[in-house]
UniProtKB/Swiss-Prot annotation:
This is Testis-specific serine/threonine-protein kinase 3. Changing residue 39 to R: Abolished serine/threonine protein kinase activity. Its cofactor is Mg(2+); Mn(2+). The lineage of its organism: Eukaryota, Metazoa, Chordata, Craniata, Vertebrata. It comes from Mus musculus. InterPro entries: Kinase-like_dom_sf, Prot_kinase_dom, Protein_kinase_ATP_BS, TSSK3_STKc. One of its GO terms (biological process) is protein phosphorylation. The modification Phosphothreonine is found at residue 168. The modification Phosphoserine is found at residue 166.
Length: 268
């Protein structure tokens, strides 16, 4: 592996992330003269569904996306032993999860600045006909004051001609919308909007809005609606946005366009 990357101009460094069928390592690119991240995917190590369905989708999608709030993919390589290497932009500030874990709840102004960028990234994706389907704090990376979305491993290109309804459960339970958890045919874009609500809640409260250790209890909590710790003093406008994002009825839940017009995001 190291020899293959070295021959392509990459000096491998430490592991910075690990997924089910992949790991991400830091590397130095002689070609770009900068540090990069390399996602290493072992085609031999994954199940058939992953290799046949999810991996080709991810590779197709990351080739086409180009937005300042989405991690850029510079190059794709494949070695003879069945490993795929995605050479990507490195976000050196870690992810939102670690930021909140180490520093506690974010001030509302900082959460707003980051969340605005997530809205822009998802607005761009949905405009390109792509649903991310695995939005969570760990997939929102930080580079200074900038937020950059990563990991399109569960992403899907939606058919243009008709409204897409999916029954596939993707992503993490804690960030999954009620209709996704229940296996009801759903609009994946509305699922992304729900997940964004969970991300914003975690940014502001440093805790999850619903207990993900018990799915039936979690579904009941989701239907009951979200509540906020009073000591954090979250503004009324922000609470209103969170309630809309975490609307259990997917028909009533706003689209990403509608989210982008919300007064909380418009105010400085």
């Amino acid at each position: 592996m190291e020899d293959f990357l070295l021959s392509n101009g990459y000096q491998l460094g430490k592991t910075i992330g690990e997924g089910t069928y992949s790991k991400v390592k830091e590397a130095f690119s002689k070609k770009h003269q900068r540090k990069v991240a390399i996602k290493i995917i072992d085609k031999m190590g994954g199940p058939e569904e992953f290799i046949q369905r999810f991996l080709p989708r991810e590779l197709q999608i990351v080739r086409t996306l180009d937005h300042k709030n989405i991690i850029q993919v510079y190059e794709m390589l494949e070695s003879a032993d069945g490993k795929i290497y995605l050479v990507m932009e490195l976000a050196e500030g870690g992810d939102v999860f670690d930021c909140v874990l180490n520093g506690g709840p974010l001030p509302e102004s900082r959460a707003k600045a980051l969340f605005r960028q997530m809205v822009e990234a998802i607005r761009y994706c949905h405009g390109c006909g792509v649903a991310h389907r695995d939005l969570k704090c760990e997939n929102a990376l930080l580079q200074g004051f900038n937020l950059k979305l990563t990991d399109f491993g569960f992403a899907k290109v939606l058919p243009k001609s008709r409204r897409e309804l999916s029954q596939t459960f993707c992503g993490s339970t804690a960030y999954a919308a009620p209709e996704v958890l229940q296996g009801i045919p759903h609009d994946s874009k509305k699922g992304d909007v729900w997940s964004m609500g969970v991300v914003l809640y975690v940014m502001l409260c440093a805790s999850l809005p619903f207990d993900d250790t018990d799915i039936p209890k979690m579904l009941w909590q989701q239907q009951k609606g979200v509540s906020f710790p009073t000591h954090l003093g979250i503004s009324t406008e922000c609470q209103d946005l969170l309630k809309r994002l975490l609307e259990p009825d997917m028909i009533l839940r706003p689209s990403i366009e509608e989210v982008s017009w919300h007064p909380w995001l418009a105010s400085t």
